[in-house]
A protein has these predicted regions:
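Conserved GNAT-fold acetyl-CoA-binding loop/helix
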Residues: 30-50
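Short loop/turn motifs at secondary-structure junctions and domain boundaries
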Residues: 51-57
């Protein structure tokens, strides 16, 4: 019997050298389907991260696992409605990475309520959000909107 070792997950400020990893992860066809997302080309992705870096209403962190860039996590919106989003490399799916990263991020982003949108087909992300305290708020034919009130 093999023991499963807990991965060391930490967050840090986004660095320019993280961006190629982020681009690669959002280009993964399986991840794009899971998130209901059309991958950006390199130029559009660079512009996206430039907007994030220069928007005072965005909090962004790099998710690092065992010294490897595993993804990103952000909050965005305005003072009345803040949203949570994250993108995890498929190499880290199912290992608790998103849950731990979100737990850590919620210590940084303390605005409540905090909302998240998740596709109805993205069971993994639904589980992550439920584990960290998000509850159903609204839905449409394709997605759930969940909220963290406290």
């Amino acid at each position: 019997m093999t023991e499963r070792r807990a991965l060391q997950v930490r967050l840090r400020e986004v660095r320019e050298e993280d961006l190629p990893s982020f681009f690669s992860y959002q280009s993964d066809p399986a991840a794009a389907v899971m998130a209901g997302f059309v991958p950006r080309d390199a130029e559009a992705d660079a512009a996206h991260w430039h907007r994030i870096a220069t928007d005072p209403m965005v909090i962004a962190r790099t998710i690092v696992v065992e010294n490897e860039v595993a993804g990103s996590i952000v909050s965005f919106g305005n003072e009345q409605e803040r949203n949570l989003g994250y993108w995890i490399s498929s190499a880290f799916w199912g290992k608790g990475t998103a849950t731990r990263a979100a737990e850590l991020f919620l210590q940084i982003e303390t605005t409540r309520p905090l909302y998240a949108h998740v596709l109805k087909t993205n069971i993994g992300s639904q589980r992550v959000l439920a584990e960290i305290g998000f509850i159903p708020f609204d839905s449409d034919s394709e997605e759930f909107v969940v909220v963290l009130r406290q």
